[in-house]
Amino acid sequence: MSKIIDILEKEQIRTDLPEFGPGDTLVVQVKIREGNNERLQAFEGICIAKRNRGIGSSFTVRKISHGEGVERVFQTHSPLVSSVTVKRRGDVRRAKLYYLRALQGKAARIKEKLEKKASV
């Protein structure tokens, strides 16, 4: 029975999403239904948590909107998530950045991860 479930889950897993992790600034395009219309809505913020559980994987994105912190949890393999783009790579030492909830302004900034140059 579990082999059938594994096969069905492998069919639904998305491979078109980029590699990202906590600390990265993401732009998530979400499909929104309003009556008969369907449109895309961008949600841009910092990824504060990532949960890897196969088809049940999810990630949490936090942004500040009009001075108020807004967090949204997205299912990684959901058909409602149209696309995810990484705007900026963050250099953090934690897997879960829940401490950002208590910080405001410049204290909530995250260092940018610099690319290593290949030596010639």
Swiss-Prot record:
Q: Which residue pairs form cystines in this protein?
A: none
Gene3D superfamilies from the UniProt entry? 2.30.30.790
Record keywords, A-Z: Ribonucleoprotein, Ribosomal protein
- Some GO term, biological process aspect, for this entry: which one? translation
Query: By its UniProt entry, which SUPFAM superfamilies does this protein fall under?
Result: Translation proteins SH3-like domain
Q: Which domain of life is it from?
A: Bacteria
Q: Which InterPro entries match?
A: Ribosomal_bL19, Ribosomal_bL19_CS, Ribosomal_bL19_sf, Translation_prot_SH3-like_sf
* Transmembrane among keywords: no
**An example molecular function term from Gene Ontology annotations:** structural constituent of ribosome
GO CC terms of this entry:
cytosolic large ribosomal subunit
Reply yes or no: does the keyword Metal-binding apply. no
| Protein family (similarity comment) | Belongs to the bacterial ribosomal protein bL19 family.
Q: PANTHER family under this entry?
A: LARGE RIBOSOMAL SUBUNIT PROTEIN BL19M, RIBOSOMAL PROTEIN L19
- Report the NCBIfam families cross-referenced here: rplS_bact
Q: What does this protein do?
A: This protein is located at the 30S-50S ribosomal subunit interface and may play a role in the structure and function of the aminoacyl-tRNA binding site.
Record protein name field:
Large ribosomal subunit protein bL19
Q: Which organism is it from?
A: Dichelobacter nodosus (strain VCS1703A)
